[in-house]
């Protein structure tokens, strides 16, 4: 610590005491007053009266006054902090006003910081910083009262204990100049600064925090868009009203909808997803390549249905040690298909088939009673059953099939492995109105004679055929003939799971060699129409022959015929005469071929020859016409070519004129540039370009314009005028 002289204490808070003799000696010597605060000291420089008149050292030495200072060094930031410094003196006997002394503040540790104490007001003395020329602290100085300098920690407590009037403290100046008072101005204790709210500093600070409120006119408030400036507002279109599209009313509510993601079955091992197995479980097999035989003579086909492979079933035989073919190899994969074990073969009997059909009939009857009211049901009964056939005829058919099932061999039964019994009664509900439209495809006849049964299922089919006449029996039930014969008119039954008897001649459904024959799902109407006349002749004498009708009733026959014929018109039956000149005349639409009755006569031959000659003349005239049209087109094209050539000449002249105007400017610039280019860059061509004057050809070459386009002759360096 640098100390100039012996450190002596300076009296503080003693306004009546004067400066000690040692201090006065130092003032007189001009060496300043030492301090016990370390290297901080003040050196008196000049002495003034309050009116600005300087005083000499003798007069200054006789002055009695006290001064106080508080300089501290911030150890944390190593910054020089000056809380306050002020000096008061006794009043001058001449002017009766307190005089003051101007000091310079020095700091050995921080030489860049310096200041001086001065006053231009008799009530205040303050410390100025030379760097900013802005007073830091302003404290009252009234009645020669010396106030101990206040630190930032003790300022609030000392201000609260002492009673100062508003005039004594310059609150506006204090808040604007001292950061200590600024921090105190925002404390909870508002009674300390009663006049702070009216100060200018308070207004400045309040403007930053003030909420600007817009007063609207009375009435309906304006609806502003979420966009500050509407894009369509400048175009004169009306502003958008309400919420923009895509904006929710309550955006803070995040609605999370649970999504059902499909379960991904991960492979248990890596090889489950990569290796192709060689052996497969016996129960899983693919469809073999069996021949698909079609019997064209009988109009029937053999179909083989096999169960598809079950994809949901795992492969327990597939392990990490399994060996398989490389997926990237081009060789075909070979699968070993083991035969189907005996315990897994489907078992199906006639009794189970009949039981299933009985259940389906009961479910159908029950659903029909619950589905339609009585009046509607009766109305549909009259429409669909005009002959009054008993609705329970299906049970009769089942009873007949029970008697015949024992005589049918199992070898003629064909099964589908996909067949499953009906799930519920709802799967068999069919509206009776829909059955009316499909009765053409379901014609069941129950005539006496040889009986053949057929069952058709939605999932599978079992065709029951009789191969020889020994296994066929005649039905002798007394009431069965009525229901079976009248079932031709009752075409409303559309149950595919029900066995229904069909009686036709053996030649219709089976061939003479007694080979197994598999019929289609539904009999074609043409087959039934051909068999109806023979059926009427071999019918029982007690049967009413008028009841046997075609697949659709006579009532609808004419309407159907009209509907089919209405959109078509009969073609013209005569042949166009122009076609007679051809050696092989073509038929026009459905016209009849030329016969002897319609052969052309001698009179017609003259007309034909004349027509032929006229056609030749017309052909020659057409050729001449085509030549004339070609000549006209050529003339037109020549005129168009002339127009295009004229436009090209006009453009060429304008381009030549533009080159002549721009060439002098280019040549001057180009020549100037060539003078600056060194010979090493252009080598041999540099001298030639310097010596040879720039021409229009060089200008066109720089622009990459061909000479022939503007008809420029490089030899004569001129335009070729045509």
Curated annotation (Swiss-Prot):
Residues 302-316 have a biased composition (Acidic residues). It comes from the Eukaryota. This is Mating-type switching protein swi2. GO terms for molecular function: sequence-specific double-stranded DNA binding. Residues 9-22, 319-332 have a biased composition (Polar residues). Required for normal mating-type switching. It comes from Schizosaccharomyces pombe (strain 972 / ATCC 24843). Keywords: Cell cycle. The gene is swi2. GO terms for cellular component: mating-type region heterochromatin; nucleolus; nucleus; Swi5-Swi2 complex. One of its GO terms (biological process) is gene conversion at mating-type locus. Interacts with swi5 and rhp51. Residues 1-35, 301-342 are annotated as: Disordered.
């Amino acid at each position: 610590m640098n100390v100039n002289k012996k450190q002596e204490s300076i009296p503080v808070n003693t306004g009546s005491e004067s400066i000690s003799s040692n201090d006065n000696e130092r003032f007189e010597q001009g060496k300043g007053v030492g301090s016990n605060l370390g290297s901080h000291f003040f050196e008196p420089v000049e002495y003034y009266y309050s009116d600005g008149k300087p005083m000499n050292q003798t007069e200054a030495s006789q002055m009695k006054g006290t001064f106080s200072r508080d300089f501290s060094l911030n150890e944390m930031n190593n910054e020089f902090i000056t809380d306050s410094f002020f000096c008061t003196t006794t009043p001058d006997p001449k002017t009766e006003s307190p005089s003051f002394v101007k000091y310079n503040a020095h700091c050995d540790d921080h030489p860049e910081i310096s200041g001086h104490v001065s006053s231009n007001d008799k009530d205040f003395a303050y410390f100025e910083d030379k760097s900013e020329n802005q007073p830091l602290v302003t404290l009252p100085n009234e009645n020669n009262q010396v106030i101990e300098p206040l630190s930032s920690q003790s300022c609030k407590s000392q201000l609260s204990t002492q009673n100062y009037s508003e005039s004594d403290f310059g609150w506006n100046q204090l808040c604007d100049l001292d950061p200590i008072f600024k921090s105190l101005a925002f404390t909870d204790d508002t009674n300390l600064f009663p006049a702070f709210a009216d100060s200018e500093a308070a207004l400045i600070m309040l403007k930053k925090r003030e909420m600007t409120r817009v007063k609207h006119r009375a009435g309906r408030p304006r609806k502003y868009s979420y966009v500050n400036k509407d894009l369509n507002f400048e175009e004169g279109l009306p502003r958008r009203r309400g919420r923009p599209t895509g904006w929710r009313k309550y955006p803070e509510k995040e609605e999370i909808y649970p999504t059902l993601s499909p379960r991904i079955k991960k492979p248990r091992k890596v090889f489950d997803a990569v290796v192709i197995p060689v052996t497969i479980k016996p129960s899983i097999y693919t469809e073999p390549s069996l021949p698909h035989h079609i019997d064209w003579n009988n109009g029937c086909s053999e179909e083989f249905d096999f169960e598809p492979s079950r994809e949901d079933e795992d492969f327990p035989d597939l392990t990490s040690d399994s060996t398989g073919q490389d997926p990237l190899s081009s060789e075909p994969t070979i699968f070993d298909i083991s035969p189907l074990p005996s315990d897994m073969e489907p078992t199906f009997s006639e009794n189970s088939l009949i039981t299933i059909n009985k259940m389906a009939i009961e479910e159908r009857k029950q659903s029909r009673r619950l589905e339609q009211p009585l009046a509607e049901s009766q109305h549909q009964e009259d429409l669909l059953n005009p002959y009054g056939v008993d609705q329970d005829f299906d049970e009769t058919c089942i009873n007949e099939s029970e008697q015949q099932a024992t005589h049918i061999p199992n070898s003629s039964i064909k099964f589908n492995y996909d067949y499953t019994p009906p799930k519920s009664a709802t799967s068999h509900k069919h509206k009776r109105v829909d059955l009316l439209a499909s009765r053409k495809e379901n014609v069941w006849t129950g005539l006496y004679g040889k009986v053949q049964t057929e069952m058709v299922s939605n999932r599978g089919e079992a065709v029951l055929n009789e191969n020889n006449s020994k296994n066929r029996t005649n039905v002798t039930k007394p009431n069965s003939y009525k229901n079976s014969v009248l079932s031709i008119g009752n075409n409303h039954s559309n149950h595919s799971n029900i066995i229904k008897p069909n009686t036709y001649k053996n030649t219709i459904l089976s061939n003479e060699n007694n080979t197994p024959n598999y019929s289609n799902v539904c009999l074609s109407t043409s087959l039934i129409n051909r068999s109806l006349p023979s059926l009427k002749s071999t019918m029982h004498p007690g049967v009413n022959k008028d009841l046997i009708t075609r697949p659709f009733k006579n009532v609808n026959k004419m309407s159907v015929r009209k509907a089919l014929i209405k959109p078509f018109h009969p073609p013209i039956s005569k042949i166009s005469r122009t076609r007679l000149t051809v050696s092989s005349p073509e038929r026009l639409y459905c016209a009849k071929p030329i016969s002897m009755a319609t052969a052309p006569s001698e009179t017609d031959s003259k007309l034909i020859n004349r027509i032929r000659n006229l056609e030749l003349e017309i052909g020659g005239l057409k050729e001449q016409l085509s030549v004339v049209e070609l000549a006209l087109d050529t003339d037109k094209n020549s005129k168009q070519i002339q127009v295009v050539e004229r436009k090209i000449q006009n453009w060429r002249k304008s381009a030549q004129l533009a080159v002549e105007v721009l060439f002098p400017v280019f040549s001057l610039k180009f020549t100037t540039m060539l003078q600056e280019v060194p010979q090493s860059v252009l080598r041999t061509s540099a001298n030639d370009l310097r010596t040879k004057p720039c021409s229009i050809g060089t200008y066109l070459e720089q622009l990459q314009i061909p000479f022939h386009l503007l008809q420029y002759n490089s030899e004569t360096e001129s335009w070729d005028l045509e």
